[in-house]
Each structure stands twice: as structure tokens, then as C-alpha cells.
């Protein structure tokens, strides 16, 4: 109930829901969309003085009552009335519920700090650093829904593009926008973007394959190559080399156009910098037209189409930068570091080379995608600075970038919020520090693996995580089977068995031989509810009522990337967490 700061104004009940409901006869709004300006007061204010920004300016007044209802299938499930705890009570109900096979909308439980992110219209680039379980992906999708509502007419679903880590995650989040009354937004991956820029010319290791190699057989040289190509020094060198190409890769020659007319090399040479407003490979057309126009003026000479095409072909031949891969190889030779470029068997490129190769291609050929008006980038920590440079060149639009530095599965090529801000040259950083997903006990356990001093757990308690030791693998496997049986008899809906690698997950699925276990691989395209066995990499962004992490011995989890994987696996659990290992020593991370 809200009363404007005006003695003559009555107290009005303001009903808020997922959608607007308008009474056409009385011409009044019965229910306001949660995104409407007046609705912001519910999320931002308690009882007492309150205000909101309307199209005509700030409206001040007082909230005298806050209630929250849940109505399902025409029946009221509950109604809570309270000065302070409306959100807390509803939030506790939601957090205690079971995980679903699809991410849900959180309109009923949006918190104040989340609402500020959702309704931020000023930031051209908004970078959200959110701890594990802070709801950052959900908040970002609600932000997209808010922007579509606020800027309807100038922004549509087709104007937005989501870069998501994999198809499973894209499927998992696919229900949120339709639930909020918006159409599904186009979705892609970093690999798809880079492949399209390079016209699908090159075979390369995927990001998943790079991570897998780092987990199973990393070499110091491989790590060194990834680290260097993820540095700002590398970007600076690449930019200097692009300038070098501009000044040294075009070598003009005389062109004999007809028996009597030769275009001198000096004249052709002068035209290359004249058209520097175009990317280098786009200049040949303009140079050809300009040269022929000058000849027409000077010699009253008109060329045939064949002669024009011949001149253009000759000018293109004078430029030594027409082959992306050769230019990229030249770059390492120019730096005096040829060892930092390595092609694998069958001319397969390393994943760390694809973004810089695309960056070079854009510098030489161009390729801005102006049809995208807002770019949403999830799992921001797993993209390197050079990948952000590619995004910046391809998509010169508004951006929402989100992730958690603590959850990187790419430790040698990851980005912090500050690094992303530097790469994109601009960006407002906002933080989500409250963790809602896991119980306090699970959160405390995760903090032992990787401490995040900014993380604030929401007070919800449960059982302490268990670390179970066994004499051999057979006993460990038998115990995991028993844990699955216990889960099936419980009220929990979802169980994630999260292994370090996909190979280990596949082997575990074969050994368990239990019906209705879903194996989630990097080739999967949908997330299913029930019992899922997968790798930590694929589990990122997902959540389960209960999580089992097998093989947490000191041989399996010992490196920094192993620590990252273990942290990701542990933070998938909402209510119950069990870790198992066989042998004498568990990982030093727990």
C-alpha cells in the first residue's frame, strides 16, 4: 500500500506480478508488471518513506503495508505480511525447495542489490562479479527482460545475443525469458563466433579439449603459450605488428594496363595510406576506382571491365597480408618468438591461437556485427583479454558481462573483472557477494578449498559435507551406489555425480551400471533432471539438490586447475554434499 506525498492523495494498493493486467472498462491497471517503475519500491524499500522514478520525475511517498502471496492453480498457497521479513521468509521457502531441470524466474525474491543491477540503464558495459550461487545468471536474464520492457520499440529479442559456455547451459536457462513474457534470445558460443570470423577455415582444439589437456597431460611449454597469449603484453605486440603490416606489407609495382598505358608503382604506393579509413584488405576496390578515375581525368581513358578487374587483382597481389595464418606466423617471427606458435598434428591449431588469429583478420578485413544491440556474456572468467578485444571489435554495442573469478576452469588464460574492464576500455563493475545456493555448511567447506573474503552466505543450515575414505576403488564404488539408493528414497529430485574430467565421468557411469543415470558430455545439448553424472567443467552454472564427488585423493586433485575443478564441483550442491576417495590420502585442498 502506497500513499504519495500529498495530503489529498489516497492510499492505493499496488499489486505486482509477472505481467501487467489492465482493466479496459475502468481503464486502470489492476496488476503492475514487476518491471514497471512503481514496482521498484517493493524491492528497494521497507515500510516507511519510499520513492520511485516515473517518466515524469521522482515520486515520493510512504509504504504502509507489504504483503506477498503465492497463488497456484487458483488456490492461495500462502500470504505473508510483515514489515521486514517478507523477502526473507519467501526467500527461505525458495532456497529450501528442490532444484529443477530448468532455471526459474526469481521475480518473487529479487533482492535489493540484485534489483540495482537489473534496472541499471546508465552503464554501457556492466561487469557483474558474482560469487558462486549469487544468482548472477538469473539476474542477467531478468536484466535483459527489464531492458526489453523498458525499451520496447527500440530493442527486441532479436537485437540481443547471449554468449554461453555450452549447449547444456543454454538449454538450462532457456525457460527464464519465456516465463517473464519475452521471446527467447539468440544464443551462441565463443567458438562459433571465432569460427565465423575466420570463415570456418581452420581446424582447432576446442576450449573443452584445451582444459582436458591441462587436466591430464599439461606441459610447461603448453602452459607458457596459453599464459602469454592471455596477456596484455601480447595484445600490445599484436597491435604494433598490425601497424607494421600497414607500413611494410604493401609493395607497389608498375602495372602495364594496356600496350600504351602503365600505372606507375609510385602512384599506386601513394594510394594505400590514402584509404586508411578502410581495413587493409578492403582498400583494393577503392584504390582501383580512384586510380582509374585519375587516369580518366588525365588521359581521357576509359577501361574495360576486364582491365579494371586485372588492375584490382594486381593491386591485391602487391599486399603480402592476404593469408591470415601466414601473417600470424610472421607475427611470431617478427617478435623473435617463433616457439610460441605451435600447430598440432594434421595442422590443428591450439585454442589459444584462434582469438588472436580472428583479431588479426578483423584488423585486416573488418567485420563489425551492428545488428546486435546488447551482448550478454556469461562465465566471463573463462575468456582471455584477447577474446574480449575480439568481442569489442565485433560488437560495438552495450554489454552485460558476468561471472566469478573463483570459478575459472581456464586458470592460465582467465580474466578478472578489472582485466575485462581494461580490455573493453570501459565498464562499470558491480558485485554480488551473497551466496544463496548452498547451505552454510557447504559454503564453509567450499571456502576451505578456495577462500573468497567477499562471499556472504545466506543463513540456511543443513548437514555437514561428508568426506568418506575407502581401502580400495571397489569399496568406494559400492558406497557411491548406496548413496544413490539413499538419494532415490529421499525427497530430493536431483543428484549430480561430478568427476574431475569427462573421461573419469564416462568410466564412472560404466562402472555404476545403474538405470536412469544421465551422462552429460560436452556433446550433450540438454540438461535433464534426476541423476546426472558429468565433469566439473560441464557442471559449471548448474545446481543439484545433492552432489557426490568421487576420487578426491591426492593424486587426482593436486594442481591449481584441479583446485578450480574441485571448487566448481563443491559449489554445485544446494542441500547435501559427499566426497569419496580410496587410498590413504585425500586431496590437500580439503
Model-derived regions: residue spans:
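Alpha-helical nucleic-acid-binding subdomain
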Residues: 148-376, 382-390, 398
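Pre-Walker A adenine-sensing motif
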Residues: 108-120
